[in-house]
Amino acid sequence: NWMATARWACRFLQNALLVDIGSTTTDIITLRDGAIRVRGYSDEARMRYDELLYTGVVRTPLMALTRHIPHAGEWTTIMAEHFATTADVYRLTGELTGTVDQSPAADGGEKTLSGSARRLARMLGTEAESFPLDYWQMNARFWRERQLEPIRAALERHLSGGGWPADAPLVGVGIGRFLVQECATRLQRPYRDINAIFPPCISTPAFSAADCTPAAALVCLASSRITGFPDDDPN
């Protein structure tokens, strides 16, 4: 999957870090001088080199993010149980749209703000009704920070190799690319959305190619082999 994305992107981008944050995993792909420059090809090697992180914006259990979270003025130890997922976090922050919110909730319950608040509360051993909804929306932002930390650290590792032009962007890919934009701001790097290198006909108002980039990239790569469309211009 990641190789299809990389092969399509390197036609248009000379130097960039592609960051594909999906429902379950995050792929970090280095493009240098218009070529794919990765160190690992197996999952084991890619995890060793921070090219594959098992963290995503829908299915990741919250217990995988941290052992403690701020709550009611204290650092609270969380439940080591699969009571809630990152989908609950981004549902509460308003960053998870219905079109990509396709996995069942951890408890099989409703995928609503109140349902997500209930699941976050359970991670802390309390009841959602003990606090107003805006409290749980604030609490969700704490969880969001815990997920950003390892992603940002991995990006810092890749950028520390040196030789990156000042205009080399972080390219946001996948349903969690809103986190890539956040990382770009914090790391003071340019940001570019992967949609910019796809032909307009690939996306529709109800469908974004960036949400399933590997599939869209395969379509474009196949089209370019068969018809010559589009080899060097996404427009």
Please place each PLM-identified region on the residue numbering.
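Helical "lid/coupling" subdomains associated with nucleotide-phosphate turnover
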Residues: 1-18, 27-235
